[in-house]
Amino acid sequence: MKFKPNQTRTYDREGFKKRAACLCFRSEQEDEVLLVSSSRYPDQWIVPGGGVEPEEEPGGAAAREVYEEAGVKGKLGRLLGIFENQDRKHRTYVYVLTVTEILEDWEDSVNIGRKREWFKVEDAIKVLQCHKPVHAEYLERLKLGCSPTNGNSTVPSLPDNNALFVTAAPPSGVPSSIR
């Protein structure tokens, strides 16, 4: 895990670390998703994301993280859900982003040699299932949600205290619970 010297972790009222991530799509059809290499395990692919900084909104944090980790900018779309990881005490706000700009060189490619690659959604799920099943759940949730073209949000607009939480499945493969 990369930790910047000036980085401050933020936590919610229940002690969960606040994180944000984006499923970055090549187009609004949402059929190809961008994954990045892990900073810890460069041969493994992950969904770009990281900690929410103080005074930062989760959507802004998600856009910042994909800029730093994947070198892309785009149109931030709907909140897919808030995914809870009990083991690591994280709550990750996962957004959909349609990529509009791809940088040739970006912060993490220069500093740590991070790579990025486009995957068909089904292939990305398979790749993520091996070592980052929580990230695969983001894409599974996307498939269960509405079609990207019908204009409906997969998550209703709710205040933080009533937000939709998807709890990560235990390694045994028990399905996620929604509370």
Curated annotation (Swiss-Prot):
<dbReference type="GO" id="GO:0046488">
    <property type="term" value="P:phosphatidylinositol metabolic process"/>
</dbReference>
<feature type="binding site">
    <location>
        <position position="65"/>
    </location>
    <ligand>
        <name>Mg(2+) 3</name>
    </ligand>
</feature>
<dbReference type="GO" id="GO:0071543">
    <property type="term" value="P:diphosphoinositol polyphosphate metabolic process"/>
</dbReference>
<keyword id="KW-0378">Hydrolase</keyword>
<dbReference type="GO" id="GO:0052845">
    <property type="term" value="F:inositol-5-diphosphate-1,2,3,4,6-pentakisphosphate diphosphatase activity"/>
</dbReference>
<feature type="binding site">
    <location>
        <begin position="38"/>
        <end position="40"/>
    </location>
    <ligand>
        <name>substrate</name>
    </ligand>
</feature>
<comment type="function">
    <text>Cleaves the beta-phosphate from diphosphoinositol polyphosphates such as PP-InsP5 (diphosphoinositol pentakisphosphate), PP-InsP4 (diphosphoinositol tetrakisphosphate) and [PP]2-InsP4 (bisdiphosphoinositol tetrakisphosphate), suggesting that it may play a role in signal transduction.</text>
</comment>
<dbReference type="GO" id="GO:0106211">
    <property type="term" value="F:inositol-5-diphosphate-1,3,4,6-tetrakisphosphate diphosphatase activity"/>
</dbReference>
<keyword id="KW-0464">Manganese</keyword>
<feature type="binding site">
    <location>
        <position position="49"/>
    </location>
    <ligand>
        <name>Mg(2+) 1</name>
    </ligand>
</feature>
<feature type="binding site">
    <location>
        <begin position="88"/>
        <end position="90"/>
    </location>
    <ligand>
        <name>substrate</name>
    </ligand>
</feature>
<feature type="binding site">
    <location>
        <position position="69"/>
    </location>
    <ligand>
        <name>Mg(2+) 1</name>
    </ligand>
</feature>
<dbReference type="GO" id="GO:0005737">
    <property type="term" value="C:cytoplasm"/>
</dbReference>
<feature type="binding site">
    <location>
        <position position="132"/>
    </location>
    <ligand>
        <name>substrate</name>
    </ligand>
</feature>
<keyword id="KW-0694">RNA-binding</keyword>
<keyword id="KW-0460">Magnesium</keyword>
<dbReference type="GO" id="GO:0005634">
    <property type="term" value="C:nucleus"/>
</dbReference>
<dbReference type="GO" id="GO:1901909">
    <property type="term" value="P:diadenosine hexaphosphate catabolic process"/>
</dbReference>
<feature type="binding site">
    <location>
        <position position="114"/>
    </location>
    <ligand>
        <name>substrate</name>
    </ligand>
</feature>
<dbReference type="GO" id="GO:0034432">
    <property type="term" value="F:bis(5'-adenosyl)-pentaphosphatase activity"/>
</dbReference>
<dbReference type="InterPro" id="IPR047198">
    <property type="entry name" value="DDP-like_NUDIX"/>
</dbReference>
<dbReference type="GO" id="GO:0046872">
    <property type="term" value="F:metal ion binding"/>
</dbReference>
<protein>
    <recommendedName>
        <fullName>Diphosphoinositol polyphosphate phosphohydrolase 2</fullName>
        <ecNumber>3.6.1.52</ecNumber>
        <ecNumber>3.6.1.61</ecNumber>
    </recommendedName>
</protein>
<feature type="domain" description="Nudix hydrolase">
    <location>
        <begin position="17"/>
        <end position="143"/>
    </location>
</feature>
<dbReference type="GO" id="GO:0008486">
    <property type="term" value="F:diphosphoinositol-polyphosphate diphosphatase activity"/>
</dbReference>
<dbReference type="GO" id="GO:1901911">
    <property type="term" value="P:adenosine 5'-(hexahydrogen pentaphosphate) catabolic process"/>
</dbReference>
<comment type="similarity">
    <text>Belongs to the Nudix hydrolase family. DIPP subfamily.</text>
</comment>
<dbReference type="GO" id="GO:0000298">
    <property type="term" value="F:endopolyphosphatase activity"/>
</dbReference>
<feature type="short sequence motif" description="Nudix box">
    <location>
        <begin position="50"/>
        <end position="71"/>
    </location>
</feature>
<dbReference type="GO" id="GO:0052848">
    <property type="term" value="F:inositol-3,5-bisdiphosphate-2,3,4,6-tetrakisphosphate 5-diphosphatase activity"/>
</dbReference>
<feature type="binding site">
    <location>
        <position position="65"/>
    </location>
    <ligand>
        <name>Mg(2+) 2</name>
    </ligand>
</feature>
<dbReference type="GO" id="GO:1901907">
    <property type="term" value="P:diadenosine pentaphosphate catabolic process"/>
</dbReference>
<feature type="binding site">
    <location>
        <begin position="17"/>
        <end position="19"/>
    </location>
    <ligand>
        <name>substrate</name>
    </ligand>
</feature>
<feature type="active site" description="Proton acceptor">
    <location>
        <position position="68"/>
    </location>
</feature>
<keyword id="KW-0963">Cytoplasm</keyword>
<dbReference type="InterPro" id="IPR000086">
    <property type="entry name" value="NUDIX_hydrolase_dom"/>
</dbReference>
<dbReference type="Pfam" id="PF00293">
    <property type="entry name" value="NUDIX"/>
</dbReference>
<keyword id="KW-0479">Metal-binding</keyword>
<feature type="binding site">
    <location>
        <position position="9"/>
    </location>
    <ligand>
        <name>substrate</name>
    </ligand>
</feature>
<dbReference type="GO" id="GO:0030515">
    <property type="term" value="F:snoRNA binding"/>
</dbReference>
<dbReference type="GO" id="GO:0034431">
    <property type="term" value="F:bis(5'-adenosyl)-hexaphosphatase activity"/>
</dbReference>
<dbReference type="InterPro" id="IPR020084">
    <property type="entry name" value="NUDIX_hydrolase_CS"/>
</dbReference>
